[in-house]
């Protein structure tokens, strides 16, 4: 695929190029290349074809530009967010899978179905791309706890120990879903009565909740010890408040200490876990500090999938997620400016890009766009697709070397918004984002037309259809004067086809 030829263009005041972007209720992302020539910067862009569009990697000499957002290892020492498959997309929309035993299972899966999906992760290209985590969402557990009051699996559906051995034998890892509550029947378990650590609160599902300031609560780390014996590698801790959709469940309004308890138990277990806290958790203080000190990632929004639909996903449902990510990363920018390490990743929810439009409910262009956003945000890349019917585009989106190179880069430098014309980070329809620059001067730039705001985007609609926007080097972070101080000796343009 060759670049279209553009005459380098600039004037004495700024470096702009108008970029027409088309909406049609999806985000069109164009190729933007920054390149150096005789100590000057130019912009070059390429409009997407009907099927493919590109991102560029930008190169400078070995000096970090201002306003970069480098990350450190996550709290539990992971270099990047988790990649793999999660079951909730199928559980929420079982109509999408003709072979799914809906009459028998409802929204609960069994071990046979999990194996049929996760075995697909053992495809060499998928595994080489880092998709190695098989994540079981809600429904694997029993309503009856063991004699110690610990949550265990539903033996009529699963043998989690055997499943773990199978997955690990295939070179995969296993994740489990959890919630802060536990069946109230556990109240009388253990010699230190579990109920002595409960608060006086029962939700509509007859779950009770721990007082996480009670020292006996940490004796419940036996739960993590049990899960370690099963070989669990990742925990999704859902319904953590403040945040989450909890009003209809009668859950307590503040369960942030559950993340602290899980983190402490993980630390004492000696096993390397990834802990994802969910969903749409409160990002104001003191809770922002709690997530940063106890989790590897947090869900920035609620579920993006519909329920009981014939489609996995509707594209407009990501508007609120994109806006919540913008707020999330802006907080990280403030932390970085205050010399705080950036260890927490923003999780955008499952990634529905693996199946064709007739299954997914999104077009090929929209699938391209979703992949870019999830990669740029350094999100967990948990596929929500039916892994048994991946099409060619789905496989390429997931496993292409350029996709994985971009994902590895963005894991170190999550994208941050830089609005055209101002360089600000407010919510706008026509948005530019940058990941990096790295200490070697590499960066990715995304231009997005989010389309008309359907109510959750946080911005004012400027119009539908094709729009024009201009961006400058200064918009992306470094000023022209600071750029000219860098050694911008000519180098090859390395174009990475992201999708």
Swiss-Prot record:
Glycans are attached at residues 154, 191, 256. One of its GO terms (molecular function) is alpha-galactosidase activity. Gene3D superfamilies: Aldolase class I. One of its GO terms (cellular component) is extracellular region. This is Putative alpha-galactosidase 8. Putative alpha-galactosidase involved in the degradation of simple oligosaccharides like melibiose, raffinose and stachyose, and of polymeric galacto(gluco)mannans. InterPro entries: Aldolase_TIM (IPR013785), Glyco_hydro_27 (IPR002241), Glycoside_hydrolase_SF (IPR017853). It comes from Emericella nidulans (strain FGSC A4 / ATCC 38163 / CBS 112.46 / NRRL 194 / M139). The keyword Ribosomal protein does not apply. CDD domains: GH27. It is an enzyme of class 3 (hydrolase). Pfam families: Melibiase_2. GO terms for biological process: carbohydrate metabolic process. Keywords: Glycoprotein, Glycosidase, Hydrolase, Secreted, Signal. It catalyses: Hydrolysis of terminal, non-reducing alpha-D-galactose residues in alpha-D-galactosides, including galactose oligosaccharides, galactomannans and galactolipids. The keyword Signal applies. Its EC number is 3.2.1.22. Belongs to the glycosyl hydrolase 27 family. The gene is agl8. The active site is at 238 (nucleophile), 303 (proton donor). It is found in: Secreted.
């Amino acid at each position: 695929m060759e670049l279209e030829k553009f005459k380098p263009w600039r004037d004495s005041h700024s470096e702009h190029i108008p970029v027409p972007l088309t909406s049609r209720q999806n985000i069109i992302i164009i190729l933007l290349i920054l390149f150096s020539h005789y100590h000057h910067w130019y912009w070059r862009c390429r409009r997407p074809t009907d099927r493919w569009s590109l991102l560029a990697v930008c190169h400078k000499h070995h000096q970090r530009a201002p306003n970069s957002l480098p990350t450190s290892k996550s709290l539990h020492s992971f270099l990047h967010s988790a990649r793999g498959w999660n079951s909730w997309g199928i559980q929420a929309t079982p109509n999408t899978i003709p072979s799914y035993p809906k009459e028998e299972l409802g929204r609960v899966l069994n071990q046979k179905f999990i194996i049929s999906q996760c075995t697909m992760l053992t495809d060499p290209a998928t595994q080489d791309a880092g998709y190695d985590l098989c994540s079981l969402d809600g429904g694997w557990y029993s309503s009856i706890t063991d004699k110690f009051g610990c949550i265990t699996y539903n033996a009529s559906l699963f043998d989690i120990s055997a499943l773990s051995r199978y997955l690990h034998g295939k070179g995969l890892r296993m994740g489990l879903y959890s919630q802060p509550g536990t069946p109230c029947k556990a109240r009388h378990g253990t010699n230190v009565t579990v109920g002595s650590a409960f608060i006086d609160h029962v939700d509509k599902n007859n779950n009770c909740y721990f007082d996480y300031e009670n020292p006996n609560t940490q004796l419940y780390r036996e739960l993590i010890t049990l899960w370690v014996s099963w070989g669990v590698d990742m925990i999704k801790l859902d319904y953590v408040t403040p945040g989450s959709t909890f009003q209809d469940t009668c859950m307590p309004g503040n369960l942030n200490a559950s993340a602290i308890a899980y983190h402490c138990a993980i630390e004492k277990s000696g096993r390397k876990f990834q802990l994802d806290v969910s969903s749409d958790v409160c990002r104001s203080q003191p809770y922002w500090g709690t997530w940063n000190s106890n989790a590897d990632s947090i869900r920035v929004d609620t579920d993006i999938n519909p329920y009981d639909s014939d489609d996995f996903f509707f594209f407009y449902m990501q508007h609120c997620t994109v806006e919540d990510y913008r707020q999330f990363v802006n907080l990280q920018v403030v932390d970085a400016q205050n010399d705080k390490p950036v260890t927490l990743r923003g999780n955008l929810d499952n990634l529905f890009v693996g199946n064709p439009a007739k299954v997914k409910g999104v077009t090929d262009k929209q699938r391209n766009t979703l992949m870019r956003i999830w990669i740029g945000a350094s999100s967990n890349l948990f596929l929500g697709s039916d892994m048994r019917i991946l099409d060619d585009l789905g496989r390429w989106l997931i496993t292409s070397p350029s996709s994985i190179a971009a994902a590895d880069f963005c894991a170190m430098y999550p994208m941050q918004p830089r609005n055209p014309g101002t360089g600000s980070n407010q919510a706008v329809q026509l948005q530019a984002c940058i990941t990096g620059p790295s200490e070697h001067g590499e960066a990715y730039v995304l231009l997005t037309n989010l389309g008309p705001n359907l109510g959750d985007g946080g911005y004012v609609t400027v119009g539908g259809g094709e729009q024009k926007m201009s961006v400058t080097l200064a918009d992306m972070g470094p000023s022209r004067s600071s750029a000219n101080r860098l050694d911008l000796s000519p180098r090859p343009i390395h174009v990475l086809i992201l999708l």
